[in-house]
Amino acid sequence: MPTVFPHDSVGLVTPQTAHFSEPLALACGRSLPAYDLIYETYGQLNAARSNAVLICHALSGHHHAAGFHSADDRKPGWWDSCIGPGKPIDTDKFFVVSLNNLGGCNGSTGPSSIDPDTGKPFGANFPVVTVEDWVNSQARLADVLNIDTWAAVIGGSLGGMQALQWTISYPDRVRHCLAIASAPKLSAQNIAFNEVARQAILTDPEFHGGSFQERGVIPKRGLMLARMVGHITYLSDDSMGEKFGRGLKSEKLNYDFHSVEFQVESYLRYQGEEFSGRFDANTYLLMTKALDYFDPAANFNDDLAKTFANATARFCVMSFTTDWRFSPARSRELVDALMAARKDVCYLEIDAPQGHDAFLIPIPRYLQAFGNYMNRISL
């Protein structure tokens, strides 16, 4: 528990909340009459307001990307390895904004928020939101912060999809787009994994049609299973083999179905247990649907190059060799389309054994490449 923070940490940070009273029309046909977005900022906005960077989070992410909320925090924000003084997203240079998206469960308006029309939690009645909806809400946050143009919009996985959508929805408001371990749309296999996770939640007896909060329960087993399935896809076979192999928790097998015998079983159960205690089941459903629905080329006759025709940003696309959830082939597909659209794009394929989660890990080669790109951004 740090009492003196590392020299390259942003230190103590305090979340802020922006309230929006203007209705937000959503892709599903519904609207949110009012909503809150919780966010954090790191660094200082320069006089020209030209150094702002937006961080977009992935499925289970949130606004707390860097620093500490108190001296007693055991861990910093989820992307602390990349945000801070002298780090790839250098807070001595950039003013960084990180938010929790609509539908989240960490302070922004979402399923666990109170529906003003009923006085009860929204639950499953919270509208389905899309990546495009998120970007529209993020643009309103930029307006509140008086940021006309982002120096960069950055995200990994689902966050990378949001960064890409920014260049489509608001082409004149983003100068650099960094899409890391991402894809222009999900594959059938990815959609299938998301559906298995959703069914684990939806069929949990404690889900109660999404109204579990009113009953004072949570669909713990469903959330655990959803997280366990998801977590397997975030790791590579090599990294799991190196970390666990066929190691046992004890010296002998129990020959039953209830004991936790293999180390990898113990790890997955721990991950599921921990996740089910901090994440909202309805939010998980929403996030997976946002992933499934992201397909911007569908509005351009499935022509990915035409999709980015109006983009003015420079692009940096990064992938990891052992990521099979968002494979390098999907990033190369994106790069090919951007090149066909005659956009300024660089592509980095990083040799890393950690799988999809590599974008969250301080891998030296990754941090160096990331930092080199960010250092070249002029303000």
UniProtKB/Swiss-Prot annotation:
Source domain of life is Bacteria
Residue numbers annotated as active site: S157 (nucleophile), D323, H356
Q: Which InterPro entries does the entry link to?
A: AB_hydrolase_1, AB_hydrolase_fold, HAT_MetX-like
Q: Which GO terms describe its cellular component?
A: cytoplasm
- Annotated coiled-coil positions are none
Domain named AB hydrolase-1: residues? 51-360
- The positions annotated as site (Important for acyl-CoA specificity) read R325
Q: Which UniProt keywords apply?
A: Acyltransferase, Amino-acid biosynthesis, Cytoplasm, Methionine biosynthesis, Transferase
User: Which reaction is recorded as catalysed by this protein?
Assistant: L-homoserine + succinyl-CoA = O-succinyl-L-homoserine + CoA
Q: In which pathway does it act?
A: Amino-acid biosynthesis; L-methionine biosynthesis via de novo pathway; O-succinyl-L-homoserine from L-homoserine: step 1/1
| UniProt xrefs under Gene3D superfamilies | 1.10.1740.110, alpha/beta hydrolase
EC top class, as a word = transferase
Q: Which SUPFAM superfamilies match?
A: alpha/beta-Hydrolases
Q: Name one GO molecular function term.
A: homoserine O-succinyltransferase activity
Location of this chain's protein in the cell: Cytoplasm
Q: Where does substrate bind?
A: R227, D357
Chief localization: cytoplasm
**One Gene Ontology biological process:** methionine biosynthetic process
Q: What EC number is given for this enzyme? A: 2.3.1.46
Q: Briefly state the protein's biological role.
A: Transfers a succinyl group from succinyl-CoA to L-homoserine, forming succinyl-L-homoserine.
Q: Which family does it belong to?
A: Belongs to the AB hydrolase superfamily. MetX family.
Indicate the quaternary assembly: Homodimer.
**What is the protein name given in its UniProt record?**
Homoserine O-succinyltransferase
**What species does this protein belong to?**
Pseudomonas syringae pv. tomato (strain ATCC BAA-871 / DC3000)
Q: Which gene encodes it?
A: metXS
